[in-house]
């Protein structure tokens, strides 16, 4: 695995779009451990819960958490770090007075563009709320066409950054057509259990999955 810490110096998340290129490289860990008051937004509640377990001094804001809990946390936390779902960001707006003191990190922001599990009004409200904060990092490890971003008012003039890794593991995905995906998946598992691993040749070397 590749981690941002490998760059050898403290990493500063930028104000704008950051294409990590590699998932799980430690960008949200930077946000949780740096010296800034930070709001980390994610569309995945389970991911937020996992991060909260790893960093118990954070505040987890998802459904069921009200503004009183947020205000109580802000009054006592020395360096507040808030983990929040996309659809709960609005709860923070009235509780945080000096928004210029804060940084916002939006993880998996490509979900705002393509995830059909989000209603359009949730996406629009989230983007409107994010405008309240002057420093926002939009994170993604998914290739996003620049032309596509340029068609969206919120992103078209935003600074765009990309991490440049010296070495990257190339993942090749093979699609299998089947009328019964469950049986096909079970068959693939059986192949692995029996030691029959798929392989490809790269630069003359056979590499197994």
Go through each PLM region and give its residues.
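Pre-Walker A adenine-sensing motif
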Residues: 1-14
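Walker A/P-loop
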Residues: 12-33
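Residue-level preference for the first positions of well-ordered beta-strands
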Residues: 14-18, 37-39, 80-81, 103, ...
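Short acidic, S/G/P-rich loop/turn micro-motifs used as interaction or catalytic elements
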Residues: 26, 45-48, 87-93, 109-118, ...
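Conserved strand-helix element at the start of the C-terminal RecA-like helicase core
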Residues: 37-51, 83-85, 185-209
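Inter-Walker segment of RecA-like/P-loop motor cores
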Residues: 55-95
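SF2 helicase catalytic motif II
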Residues: 86-88, 95-137
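Interdomain hinge/linker at the junction between the two RecA-like core domains of SF2 helicases
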Residues: 143-192
